[in-house]
Amino acid sequence: MVKKQHVAGQLARQFHKVSMAHLQADDARDEYAMAAYQGRMDAIREEVSWHQASCGAGALMQLGAAATIVDQAVDRLKPCELMALKRLIVSLAGFVEANSNDRRSDFDRGYLGI
């Protein structure tokens, strides 16, 4: 049985697999597969926000979800607020990396958002 506190880490691993499959579909120019994988990545980003991070990968995934939300709210934020939020997210990601074995480079940074 899956413990609730480990869900964010499992979602991070799923996200990594799906993002790698998305890149392969992109290389193969398979638009249908790319759209399907993009939908799955968006769903995982939404799902991860409901769970507590219990590992570095889960925390990075949650920071990636936060970065995506910030990017979607860019037209509602002052430029100084936008830059401050981005700096905070990157700073927290650096803290997670310094205190865990997980790295942003373990993910496709274009999809993680940080």
Q: Which functions belong to the PLM regions below?
A:
Residues 1-114:
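Sequence/structural signature of long amphipathic alpha-helices
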